Amino acid sequence: MKKNRLWVLFALLIIALAANGYAEENYKIGVLAKNGPVKALQMWKATGDYLTSKIPGKTFEIVPLGFNEVYPAIESGKISFFLANSSMFVTAKVRYGAKAVATMVNSRQGQPLKYFGGVIITSDANDQINALNDLKGKKFMAVQESSFGGWQMAYKALLDAGINPYTDFTKLDFGGKHDNVVYAVMNGVVDAGTVRTDTLERMASAGEIDMADFKIINPQKFNDFPFACSTTLYPEWPLAKVKSTSDTVARSIVDALKQLKATDAAAKSAKVVGWVDALDYAPVEALQKTLKVGAFMAAK
């Protein structure tokens, strides 16, 4: 009888240890919630579920993060992976040793896109603004200072045109969200603004705006790129691992993501075609160095 009890206790101990081991295999993926946490979960929860279903013994949880929450989450060890704009990744790479493991292939207007840009807009009725130089002395709005497509790309284009937005604009505001910037321009709160490419088309498709009400400043044309754009194109958002996350786990995630089909629920909700191995983010790092932002921000 005593021997049977010992076997039962031993079996329970094994079960408890196994359960504890599986509990430790939960991985949190931080996602930059550029349009708020609710939309971020709507877009990316299915990707977490997809990875959980594809990788045995591991679960993946999506954690929406605001612009000011990404770096603290990395530094504190709250997350194992993160999905953020390309500039924020470069900052995390330089500061915290993060490593890009995959790049999303966006799905927009039926085309797979590995690159994106920024678009500078004004009201179509504004006859005073037709080129970048016309923005001097005007009120301007961007998304956030840390927003790559919603500020830093346009900032670089403005500097290249001889315009310092911090001294040449009468007012420089940050709207917090891409849609807020579009509405501020539409309603005359500011003279012009900048958002990432595909924002205007997305809002127009949803019936929220009419593209004809806006004028594109410094329009650029690129082969196989369907959106209004005012800047150079840069690689799309990467999925990155924090320094402490094992390469083995990262590789298993990349392998699973590369198997994702455009018709899968996770791809549809995230509005992506799929994923590829990480692209080269050196041009993004060069932009940061030029602007002295992100990892290369000048000490105050």
Predicted regions mapped to residue ranges:
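Extracytoplasmic small-molecule ligand-binding "clamshell" domains
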Residues: 24-90
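An extracytoplasmic/periplasmic, membrane-proximal ligand-sensing/linker region
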Residues: 24, 30-46, 55, 199, ...
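Bacterial N-terminal signal peptides
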Residues: 9-18
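Pocket-lining segment of extracytoplasmic ligand-binding domains
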Residues: 139-248
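Short helices/loops that flank or line small-molecule/ion binding pockets
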Residues: 68-86, 90-91, 95-96, 116, ...
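Bacterial N-terminal signal peptides that target proteins for export
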Residues: 1-8
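Boundary at the C-terminal end of the N-terminal hydrophobic targeting segment
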Residues: 19-23
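Bilobed "Venus flytrap"/periplasmic-binding protein-like clamshell domains
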Residues: 28-52, 112-182, 198, 267, ...
